[in-house]
UniProtKB/Swiss-Prot annotation:
Similarity comment: family membership: Belongs to the RNA polymerase beta' chain family. RpoC2 subfamily.
Cofactor(s) required, per the database record: Zn(2+)
Listed Basic and acidic residues bias regions: 644-668, 678-688
Gene: rpoC2
Protein name: DNA-directed RNA polymerase subunit beta''
InterPro entries assigned: DNA-dir_RpoC2_beta_pp (IPR012756), RNA_pol_beta''_euk (IPR050254), RNA_pol_Rpb1_3_sf (IPR042102), RNA_pol_Rpb1_4 (IPR007083), RNA_pol_Rpb1_5 (IPR007081), Rpb1_funnel_sf (IPR038120)
A GO term, aspect molecular function: zinc ion binding
Species annotation: Saccharum officinarum
Length: 1534
C-alpha cells in the first residue's frame, strides 16, 4: 500500500490515442504477457463503469448550439451581399457560386468547433458527447449533422448545390432540404451495397500480389536509402511516425560526433535526439537516410534491415515472417470500413477553404502595421498579409484580449477598427498542396427573364462556329438583358407620349419573329410593312393585312435570315453579324433590284477577319423552289468564243426578254403541254411562285431587260465554290461545255455551243474592261473584282471550298466562267434500312404515291432504289420516258436546249425549255435501254453588269489600304443532289463583296458605325479600320470618355468614305425608315444611315407633294438650331446633350432633333382610343399591332433636380447603361437599366439585368436577340479543384493500386522535368546523368504513390504504416518492359521482367539491355509473377496454365500460395528453416570486401549528398551483385 500511495494520480480523461500510448509503453517496460493482464483489468473496469452509468441516447440529449442562430444569420448576410453584387453585375455566376459555397462551408466548420466547446462547457457527461468524442460510436461530423447544421450537399454529379441545409436532424428538415439531402443518402445506401464486395476483392488482389514476400535474410547489403528531413514541410508527428521502427542506411553525425550508426534500428529515444538536434540547428542538420523495402536488393523476398521493426512487438522482424500477406491485409481491411463512409459534403473541399479567426469580444483591435502588407483576398476584398506570426490585441472596456495570428494569414480588418464579438478578423491560409489538380468545368448561365440581349464590348466569333451564333468574349464585360414583355395585343397597353407630342414614325417596337415570313405556303406575304405613297388622305396602315409587299419605299432590314426564311431549322443562317441591306438611288431607279437583295454584313462592334464577306446580293431569281430537291449542273465557257458571239447573242437576248414576261404568265399552261407528266403541278422556279411576291419589281420588266442581271454568292458553308481559274482542271475546251462527273449514273456530256447566251451588255468592255460609271480610283482594281484575287476566298470552311489559285495577270484566253446552270427536279428520300417500301425499283409512279408507311411522293416519275449499308436511298426522277428505236443516236446525260426538235421522238412542236436526257438500262438486258427526258430549269449567269451599281466602288478605298473585291459563288456542287429543306428557298448564286487589306501583320479589321459630330451636326459612317489603329474621333458605344468632336476639315475631304459620292440629289422617300425587325425596334433615319454622303447633313423628312422621292439640295449644312423636347418644349441647343444615333439605338422613343423649317415638323396626335392609332399632320392614321409592348413597370422615372441638371449632362446620354446603386446625383438609382428617355427634369430607365461575363466565356445568341426566360445566355469555362473525395475512400485507393490514371497531369510537370534534366548532369558530371536520372525518377514515383495512398487513408482517419504500402508499391513498380530498340539475346522485346533481374542479366552478358520502367496495376502484377500456379489460382486459370505449358515454365514453389495449392509446407515460420543453408561468416566477409571498393563509396557520397532534389534510392553502382540463393532453387528459367 505504501508503494501505491507514492504513485501520481493523473486526474485526466483518457481517449483512444492515450490508450494506444499507454499500451505501447507497457509493452516496452513489461513485455507482452504482463501487458495483457493489465489490459484485462482495464477492460473489466470499463465494462463495469459503462454498466453503472447505463448510457443511453435520447432525443433530449441532442443539445442545439446556442451560437448557431447568429452564425447562420451572419452567413446569410454575406450571401445576401453576394447576391446583390451579382445582381449589380459586380461578380459573375462562377464567383458567386464559389464564394457562397465557401461562406457556408466555413460557417459549418466553425459551428462544428463551437459544438465541441459547447458540450465540454455545458454538459461534459452528455451521452452524445461521451460516445462520439471518446470514439466509441459516431464521429464529430455525424454529431454535427444531428445538432449543428447539415451544411452543403453535392448533387449526383458531384457539383455543390449552393443552397445549404441550415437545419439539423434534431430540428427537422424542410421539404426542399429533405430532397436535397436524399442525394447523399441514396449514394450512401448504394455504396454500402456495392462496395462491400469491392473491398473484399481489393484485399484478395493485394494479398495475391505480395503473398510470396517473406523475410529471408538479415541484410541484403544495399547502400541506398530514402532521405527524411523535417525541413521538407513534414509535420513533427509524421516525422516521428516515419522514423520509428526503421533502420538507418547511413551514419548520422551532429557536428563531428556520430550519434547513430548504419544498420541501427530507430527507437523513440533516438527520434527525440534527432528532433532536439533539428530544433537546435535547423539549417545545419543533415537529412536522415533510412532503409525501406524499396531499397532492398533482393528480387522476390525482403531482408530484415530493409523492413525494420515488426509493428506488433518492437523488435526487428523475424526471419520467415510473411510480411507480404500482413501488408496486403493491413491495407485491405480498412477498405471494408471506408465503404460505409459517404461524407455529407460529397467531399468537394480539398483544403481550399480557410479557417477563420473570430474576435473574442467587442472592442478596438490593434496590431503593428509594419508587420503586415496590404493585399487582396482571393475574392478581391482588401486585406493585410502577415509576414510573421502576429500578435493582435483587442481592447474592450475592462479587459484586454490578445490573439495570435499565424504567418501567411490574411487580416480582414484595419488597425484601430472597432470589432464586434465573433466578427471574423483573420483568415488562416490552408496549406495548399503544390500539385493541386484542377479540372475544367462548364457552367451555363440561363436568362432569368424575357428580354433582349446587349453586350458592351467587342466579341469574337468562335472560329469553329463561323456561321453559328456563339461568340467568345475577349475581355471581361457585361451582358445586358433589357426587359420586354411578350404580349401580342392590338391594344397598346402603355404609351409614353402625351397628346400632340412630337415623335418618330412608328416608334413602337415590333417583334421581328412575325414580320418577314416568306416561308408561308401561299405566296402572299402576311405583313404589309409600309405603304409609302399616300393615295388617299386617310389611308389606314395596318401591320397585319395579308397584302402585296410594297417595294419602292426604300427601307432597310437587318438579317437576311429574316428575309429568306425564319425557320428555326436553319441554324446555319448567318446570324452572326448585322446585315444591313443597302438602299439605292433615284438615279438607279431603272435598275430596280429587289429591295431585299443586297445586304451588308457588319459584325456589331466586331472584328472583321481577313477576307471576310462584307456585303452580298442574293438575286431572288436564283432561288430554288421550295417544293423539291434536285440537281444543279454547270457549264463553263471560254471568253474568246464569248467575244465572238456577243453581238448576235445580244440581239436574240433582247427578243427573249420581250417574251419573258408572257412566259411568266403562261408558264403554268405551258408546262402542262410541254411535259405530259403529273409533274406539272410543281411549277419550276422561274414560274410565278416567286414573281407573285415581287410583283412590284417586275411590273415594269419590259423597260428593264438590260439590267435584269444575275449576281451570285455563297450560301451555307457546306458547299463548294467553283474554281474560277480552272484551266488546270478543265483544259481549255473552246467549243465544248462540260459538266463535272456526277454520281456515277451521269456520264460527261458534250454538246454544241451555238445557243449560248452571252452577256446582255452591249460592249465587251463593260464586262471585262473598266467600268464607265465607276469612280476613277477603282478602275485598276476592277478586273480583279471580277475574277478574284489569289487568296480571295480563304475564309470559307476548310473542306467545303476549293481555294482560288488565281494569278495576278488574267489571260482572257483561258478564263472560263460558268455561264449558266440548270436545276433538274428530282426527289430523294433517305429511309432507314428496315423500312418496307411500297414501290418497286424501276417502277413508274404518279404524284402522291405512298412510298412507305408514312412518306408519300411529291413528284411522279421513275423510281430508283439503292440499298446502302446504313440506309436505303429512294430517288424519283420526274419527266417523260421514251423507248428509242435506234440505240446509237442518243447521248446519255445531254442537256438539250430549247428551239431544237428531238430527232427520235414523235413530238414535232418546238420546246421552249431545256430538257435533260438520261439513258437508263433495262434490267437483265444488255442492249435495251430507255431514255428519261426531264425538264430542266436554266439559270443564266451573266457577269455583265458589275456590282458597281449595287455596291459603290469608292467605298473604303483610301482608308488603311482596304481592298474590296467581288467574288461570285455558286452554292451547290455540280450534279450533286440538293436536299429539300422544309419551308426554305435555297439560294443558288450569291455575289459577295470581300474585304481584304495589304498589311500582313494585321489580322483583323474593326467594323463599326461611327457617329461623327461637329458643332451640332451628326453624321454616321461605316468605319472599317485595321485593329490596333483606333482613330480617336470615334465615340465608342456608351463610352463617355472620348469626346466625339473632330475638326471640320476632316469631313470636307473628298475621299471621305461617302456612300454615294456622285449623288448631288439625296433621294429620300417620304418615309425612309429602318425597321429593325429581329432587333425589336423601328426607327426612322432621315439620312442614309450607313454612309452619309460627305456633303449632306442629317436632313429631316420632307413633305413635298410634287417630288415625293427627291429633295433639291439646299445648303446642306443647316445648323440645327433648336431641339424640340418631348412635349414640344423648345430646349436651347446644348452641345453635349444629343441623342446618339447608332445603328442600334435602343427602342427609339427618344428626343429627336429637327431642322427648324416649317414643313419639316412632323407632329403626331395620339388618339386616346381603344385601338391605338396615330394621326400625323397629313391626317394619315396608323394602326399598331405591337408584339412587344413596354409595360409601365419596366420603366423607372428618375426626376432630376434643377440644380443638378448641369452636372448630370456630362454623365447621362441616351442608351447608356446604368447599374443599380450608382450614385449619379443626390439619390441612388434603384434599379439597373438603360436610359431611355431624357426630359428636362427626369429621365426614364428601361429595366435591364446585367450579367458579368469573364474573358473567354461563350455568349449564345446575337446582339439584340430576344431571349425567353430560361434560355441559355452564356457559358463559363472555369477551373475547379478536382474533388478528391467524390471517388472517396476505397475507389480512390483502388484506382492508384490498379495504376489507372485518375488525375490530369500536374500543370508544371514539364517544367520540373526540364529543370531536373538540367541539374542532374551539372551535379553528377555528364556521363552518369541520365542513368541516375532514370533511376531517381522510378524512386520518386514510388514515393509519390505511397504519399497519395496515405493521403486518402488519412483523410478517412485511418492510420496505416508506410511500410505496408511500400511493399505493395514495390511489387507494382518493380517490373520493366524490354524495349525493341536494343534486341538482346536473352529477353524477347515486350517481355515483362523484374528490374533487378534485368540489371543482373546486363552485367552477366556484358551487353546493354534496353528496357523502360512501367507501372503495373495489382491485377496485372498478380498475373506476372514467377509462379504460374499462383497466377492460375488467381484468374484465367485455363489460359495461364496453357501458356505455361507451351512455354515449358518451371515453378520453384517460392511463395505461400503455390505450396498451399500443392499441399506442401509453406516456407514461412518454422517451415522457413529448410530454405536456409548459409553461414553468417560468408556474409560478413562479403561486406568487408565490398566496402574496400573506393569507387563505390565515392559514388555513394555523391548520391547521398544531393538527394534533397528528390528522395533517391538509385542503384547506380553496378559493381555490387548479389550472390544467388541456395543452389537447389534457381529462380529464373528462361
Amino acid at each position: 500500500m505504501a508503494e501505491r500511495a507514492n504513485l501520481v494520480f493523473h486526474n485526466k480523461e483518457i481517449d483512444g490515442t492515450a490508450i494506444k500510448r499507454l499500451i505501447s509503453r507497457l509493452i516496452d517496460h513489461f513485455g507482452m504477457g504482463y501487458t495483457s493482464h493489465i489490459l484485462d483489468q482495464i477492460k473489466t473496469l470499463g465494462f463495469h463503469q459503462a454498466t453503472t452509468t447505463s448510457i443511453s441516447l435520447g432525443i433530449e440529449d441532442l443539445l442545439t448550439i446556442p451560437s448557431k442562430g447568429w452564425l447562420v444569420q451572419d452567413a446569410e448576410q454575406q450571401s445576401f451581399l453576394l447576391e446583390k453584387h451579382y445582381y449589380y453585375g459586380a461578380v459573375h455566376a462562377v464567383e458567386k457560386l464559389r464564394q457562397s459555397v465557401e461562406i457556408w462551408y466555413a460557417t459549418s466548420e466553425y459551428l462544428k468547433q463551437e459544438m465541441n466547446s459547447n458540450f465540454r462547457i455545458t454538459d461534459p457527461s452528455n451521452p452524445v458527447y461521451l460516445m462520439s468524442f471518446s470514439g466509441a460510436r459516431g464521429n464529430a461530423s455525424q454529431v454535427h449533422q444531428l445538432v449543428g447544421m447539415r451544411g452543403l450537399m453535392a448533387d449526383p454529379q458531384g457539383q455543390m448545390i449552393d443552397l445549404p441545409i441550415q437545419s439539423n436532424l434534431r430540428e427537422g428538415l424542410s421539404l426542399t432540404e429533405y430532397i436535397i439531402s436524399c442525394y447523399g443518402a441514396r449514394k450512401g445506401v448504394v455504396d454500402t451495397a456495392v462496395r462491400t464486395a469491392d473491398a473484399g476483392y481489393l484485399t484478395r488482389r493485394l494479398v495475391e500480389v505480395v503473398q510470396h514476400i517473406i523475410v529471408r535474410r538479415r541484410d541484403c547489403g544495399t547502400i541506398q536509402g530514402i532521405s527524411v528531413s523535417p525541413q521538407n514541410g513534414m509535420t513533427e508527428k509524421l516525422f516521428v511516425q516515419t522514423l520509428i521502427g526503421r533502420v538507418l542506411a547511413d551514419d548520422i553525425y551532429i557536428g563531428s560526433r556520430c550519434i547513430a550508426s548504419r544498420n541501427q534500428d530507430i527507437g523513440i529515444g533516438l527520434v527525440n535526439r534527432f528532433i532536439t538536434a533539428f530544433r537546435a540547428q535547423p539549417f545545419r542538420a543533415q537529412p536522415i537516410y533510412i532503409r525501406t523495402p524499396f531499397t532492398c536488393r533482393s528480387t522476390s523476398w525482403i531482408c530484415q534491415l530493409c523492413y525494420g521493426r515488426s509493428p506488433t512487438h518492437g523488435d526487428l522482424v523475424e526471419l520467415g515472417e510473411a510480411v507480404g500477406i500482413i501488408a496486403g491485409q493491413s491495407i485491405g481491411e480498412p477498405g471494408t470500413q471506408l465503404t460505409l463512409r459517404t461524407f455529407h459534403t460529397g467531399g468537394v473541399f480539398t483544403g481550399g477553404t480557410a479557417d477563420l479567426i473570430r474576435s473574442p469580444s467587442n472592442g478596438k483591435i490593434q496590431f503593428n502595421e509594419d508587420l503586415v502588407h496590404p493585399t487582396r483576398t482571393r475574392h478581391g476584398q482588401p486585406a493585410f498579409l502577415c509576414y510573421i506570426d502576429l500578435h493582435v490585441t483587442i481592447q474592450s472596456q475592462d479587459i484586454l484580449h490578445s490573439v495570435n495570428i499565424p504567418l501567411k494569414s490574411l487580416i480582414l480588418v484595419q488597425n484601430d477598427q472597432y470589432v464586434e464579438s465573433e466578427q471574423v478578423i483573420a483568415e488562416i491560409r490552408a496549406g495548399m498542396s503544390t500539385l493541386h489538380f484542377k479540372e475544367k468545368v462548364q457552367k451555363h448561365i440561363y436568362s432569368e427573364s424575357d428580354g433582349e440581349m446587349h453586350w458592351s464590348t467587342d466579341v469574337y466569333h468562335a472560329p469553329e462556329y463561323q456561321y453559328g451564333n456563339l461568340r467568345r468574349l475577349p475581355k471581361t464585360s457585361h451582358l445586358w438583358i433589357l426587359s420586354v414583355s411578350m404580349c401580342r395585343s392590338s391594344i397598346a397597353s402603355f404609351s409614353l407620349h402625351k397628346d400632340q407630342d412630337q415623335m418618330n414614325t412608328y416608334s413602337f417596337s415590333v417583334d421581328g419573329r412575325y414580320i418577314f415570313d416568306f416561308s408561308m405556303a401561299n405566296d402572299q406575304v402576311s405583313h404589309r410593312l409600309l405603304d409609302t405613297f399616300g393615295k388617299k388622305d386617310r389611308e389606314i396602315l395596318d401591320y397585319l393585312t395579308p397584302d402585296r409587299i410594297v417595294s419602292n419605299g426604300h427601307w432597310n432590314c437587318f438579317y437576311p435570315s429574316i428575309l429568306q426564311d425564319n425557320s428555326d431549322l436553319l441554324a446555319k443562317k448567318r446570324r452572326n453579324r448585322f446585315v444591313v441591306p443597302l438602299q439605292y438611288h433615284q438615279e438607279q431607279e431603272k435598275e430596280r433590284i429587289s429591295c431585299l437583295g443586297i445586304s451588308m454584313e457588319i459584325p456589331f462592334m466586331g472584328v472583321l477577319r481577313r477576307n471576310t464577306i462584307f456585303a452580298y446580293f442574293d438575286d431572288p431569281r436564283y432561288r430554288k423552289d421550295k417544293r423539291g430537291s434536285g440537281i444543279v449542273k454547270f457549264r463553263y465557257r471560254t471568253l474568246e468564243e464569248e467575244y465572238r458571239t456577243q453581238e448576235e447573242e445580244y440581239r436574240t437576248r433582247e427578243e427573249e426578254y420581250r417574251t419573258r414576261e408572257e412566259e411568266y404568265r403562261t408558264r403554268e399552261e405551258d408546262s402542262e403541254d410541254e411535259y405530259e407528266s403529273p409533274e406539272n403541278k410543281y411549277r419550276t422556279r422561274e414560274g410565278e411562285g416567286e414573281y407573285e411576291i415581287l410583283e412590284d419589281e417586275y411590273r415594269t420588266l419590259e423597260d428593264e431587260y438590260e439590267t435584269l442581271e444575275d449576281e451570285y454568292g455563297i450560301l451555307e458553308d457546306e458547299y463548294r465554290t467553283l474554281e474560277k481559274d480552272s484551266e488546270e482542271e478543265y483544259g481549255s475546251l473552246e467549243n465544248k461545255y462540260r459538266t463535272r462527273e456526277g454520281e456515277g449514273e451521269y456520264e460527261i456530256l458534250e454538246e454544241d455551243s451555238e445557243e449560248e447566251y452571252g452577256s446582255s451588255e452591249d460592249g465587251s468592255e463593260k464586262e471585262y474592261g473598266t467600268l464607265e460609271e465607276d469612280s476613277e480610283e477603282d478602275s485598276e482594281e476592277d478586273s480583279e473584282d471580277e475574277y478574284g484575287s489569289p487568296e480571295e476566298n480563304s475564309i470559307l470552311k476548310k473542306e467545303g471550298f476549293i481555294e482560288h489559285r488565281g494569278t495576278k495577270e488574267f489571260s482572257l484566253k483561258y478564263q472560263k466562267e460558268v455561264d449558266r446552270f440548270f436545276f433538274i427536279l428530282q426527289e430523294l428520300h433517305i429511309l432507314p434500312r428496315s423500312s418496307s417500301l411500297k414501290v418497286l425499283d424501276n417502277s413508274i409512279i404518279g404524284v402522291d404515291t405512298q412510298l412507305t408507311k408514312n412518306t408519300r411522293s411529291r413528284l411522279g416519275g421513275l423510281v430508283r432504289v439503292k440499298r446502302k449499308k446504313s440506309h436505303t436511298e429512294l430517288k424519283i426522277f420526274s419527266g417523260d420516258i421514251h423507248f428509242p428505236e435506234e440505240a446509237d443516236k442518243i447521248l446519255g446525260g445531254s442537256l438539250i436546249p430549247p428551239e431544237r426538235e428531238k430527232k427520235d421522238s414523235k413530238e414535232s412542236k418546238k420546246r421552249k425549255n431545256w430538257v435533260y436526257v438520261q439513258r437508263k438500262k433495262i434490267l437483265k438486258s444488255k442492249e435495251k435501254y430507255f431514255v428519261s427526258v426531264r425538264p430542266a430549269v436554266a439559270y443564266e449567269m451573266d457577269e455583265g453588269r458589275n456590282l458597281a451599281t449595287l455596291f459603290p466602288q469608292d467605298l473604303l478605298q483610301e482608308e488603311d489600304n482596304l481592298q474590296l473585291r467581288l467574288v461570285n459563288f455558286i452554292s451547290h456542287e455540280n450534279s450533286k443532289l440538293t436536299q429539300r429543306i422544309y419551308h426554305t428557298n435555297s439560294q443558288f448564286v450569291r455575289t459577295c463583296l470581300v474585304v481584304n487589306w495589304e498589311q500582313e501583320e494585321k489580322e483583323g479589321a474593326r467594323a463599326s458605325l461611327v457617329e461623327v459630330r461637329t458643332n451640332d451636326l451628326i453624321r454616321d459612317f461605316l468605319r472599317i479600320e485595321l485593329v490596333k489603329s483606333t482613330i480617336s474621333y470615334t465615340r465608342r458605344r456608351y463610352d463617355r470618355t472620348s469626346v466625339g468632336l473632330i475638326p471640320n476639315n476632316r469631313l470636307d475631304r473628298n475621299n471621305t468614305n461617302s456612300f454615294y459620292s456622285k449623288a448631288k440629289i439625296q433621294s429620300l422617300s417620304q418615309h425612309q425608315e429602318v425597321i429593325g425587325t429581329l432587333l425589336n425596334r423601328n426607327k426612322e433615319y432621315p439620312s442614309l444611315m450607313i454612309l452619309l454622303a460627305s456633303n449632306c447633313s442629317r436632313i429631316g423628312l420632307f413633305k413635298n407633294s410634287k417630288y415625293p422621292n427627291a429633295v433639291k439640295e439646299s445648303n446642306p449644312r443647316i445648323p440645327i438650331r433648336d431641339i424640340f423636347g418631348l412635349l414640344g418644349v423648345i430646349v436651347p441647343s446644348i452641345s453635349n446633350f444629343s441623342s446618339s444615333y447608332y445603328l442600334l439605338t435602343h427602342n427609339q422613343i427618344l428626343l429627336k432633333k429637327y431642322l427648324f423649317l416649317d414643313n419639316l415638323k412632323q407632329t403626331f396626335q395620339v388618339l386616346q382610343g381603344l385601338k391605338y392609332s396615330l394621326i400625323d399632320e397629313n391626317k394619315r392614321i396608323s394602326n399598331f399591332d405591337s408584339n412587344i409592348m413596354l409595360e409601365p413597370f419596366h420603366l423607372n422615372w428618375h426626376f432630376l433636380h434643377h440644380d443638378s441638371w448641369e452636372e448630370t449632362l456630362a454623365i447621362i446620354h441616351l442608351g447608356q447603361f446604368i447599374c443599380e446603386n450608382l450614385c449619379l446625383f443626390k439619390s441612388h438609382i434603384k434599379k439597373s437599366g438603360q436610359i431611355f428617355i431624357v426630359n428636362m427634369d427626369s429621365f426614364v430607365l428601361r429595366a435591364a439585368k446585367p450579367y458579368l461575363a469573364t474573358i473567354g466565356a461563350t455568349v449564345h445568341g446575337h446582339y439584340g436577340k430576344i431571349l425567353y426566360k430560361g434560355d441559355r445566355l452564356v457559358t463559363f469555362i472555369y477551373e475547379k479543384s478536382r474533388s478528391s473525395d467524390i471517388t472517396q475512400g476505397l475507389p480512390k485507393v483502388e484506382q492508384i493500386f490498379e495504376a489507372r490514371s485518375i488525375d490530369s497531369l500536374s500543370p508544371n510537370l514539364e517544367r520540373r522535368i526540364e529543370d531536373w534534366n538540367e541539374r542532374i548532369p551539372r551535379i553528377l558530371g555528364v556521363p552518369w546523368g541520365f542513368l541516375i536520372g532514370a533511376e531517381l525518377t522510378i524512386a520518386q514515383s514510388r514515393i509519390s504513390l505511397v504519399n497519395k495512398i496515405q493521403k486518402v487513408y488519412r483523410s478517412q482517419g485511418v492510420q496505416i504504416h508506410n511500410r505496408h504500402i511500400e511493399i505493395i508499391i514495390r511489387q507494382v513498380t518493380s517490373k520493366v518492359r524490354v524495349s525493341e530498340d536494343g534486341m538482346s539475346n536473352v529477353f524477347l522485346p515486350g517481355e515483362l521482367i523484374g528490374l533487378l533481374r534485368a540489371e543482373r542479366a546486363g552485367r552477366a552478358l556484358d551487353e546493354s539491355i534496353y528496357y523502360r520502367a512501367i507501372l503495373l496495376g495489382i491485377t496485372r502484377a498478380s498475373l506476372n509473377t514467377q509462379s504460374f500456379i499462383s497466377e492460375a489460382s488467381f484468374q484465367e486459370t485455363a489460359r495461364v496454365l496453357a501458356k505455361a505449358a507451351l512455354r515449358g515454365r518451371i515453378d520453384w514453389l517460392k511463395g505461400l500460395k503455390e505450396n498451399v495449392v500443392l499441399g506442401g509446407i509453406i516456407p514461412v515460420g518454422t517451415g522457413f528453416q529448410k530454405f536456409v543453408h548459409r553461414s553468417p561468416q560468408d556474409k560478413n566477409l562479403y561486406f568487408e570486401i565490398q566496402k574496400k571498393n573506393l569507387f563505390a563509396s565515392e559514388m555513394r557520397d555523391i548520391l547521398f549528398l544531393h538527394t534533397e532534389l528528390v528522395s533517391s534510392d538509385s542503384d547506380v553502382t553496378n559493381n555490387f551483385y548479389e550472390t544467388s540463393e541456395t543452389p537447389f532453387t534457381p529462380i529464373y528459367t528462361i
